[in-house]
Amino acid sequence: TIINENGQTKLNINSYIGKTTINKSQKADDVTIKVVETDVYFDYQTFTFEITNKRDTPILINDPNIDSTMYIEDKNATHYQAYTHELAETDTKVPAGQTQTVKIKYYSRYSSNKVIKYTAFDRIILNYNAYSHYTNIGAYKDYGSIKIEIPQN
């Protein structure tokens, strides 16, 4: 792809469009999620997050039984789901009292007029120890949610 940026012509290789630094965070239930940056590709978009767990139990940022709980949302309220099948449990599980960085890929085909307004984590498992002991996962109810507004340049 050839783009014109700040009066300069640039060539994007391997469908890479560009990077944007964001550094915006949101906190709920003693969990802070910071959106560090995003990389845009022709067929998808990645976001790098720093997740801080100040709880006394490990958390899981994605319910593995439901695919649609991590997404990005555009200005038209369209949701683009995360590629959760590419994430290992070690990517989404944050131990108590620790900060972890994870890069998450989303289904989001490039468009020059697409504006991503939010990243969302709708079903954070706030007590992974308790969750992992449930034989009936549907009975577990200790969930959190964080939605982070993406500033527009």
Predicted regions and their residues:
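Surface-exposed edge beta-strand/loop patches
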Residues: 1-33, 59-80, 92-153
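Short, conserved, surface-exposed binding loops centered on an aromatic residue
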Residues: 25, 38-41
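Short structured motifs
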Residues: 31-37, 85-90
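Short, solvent-exposed loop/turn segments enriched in Ser/Thr/Gly
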Residues: 41-48
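Asparagine-centered strand-capping/turn motif at beta-strand->loop junctions
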Residues: 49-58
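Low-complexity, intrinsically disordered/propeptide-like segments
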Residues: 52, 64, 74, 85-86
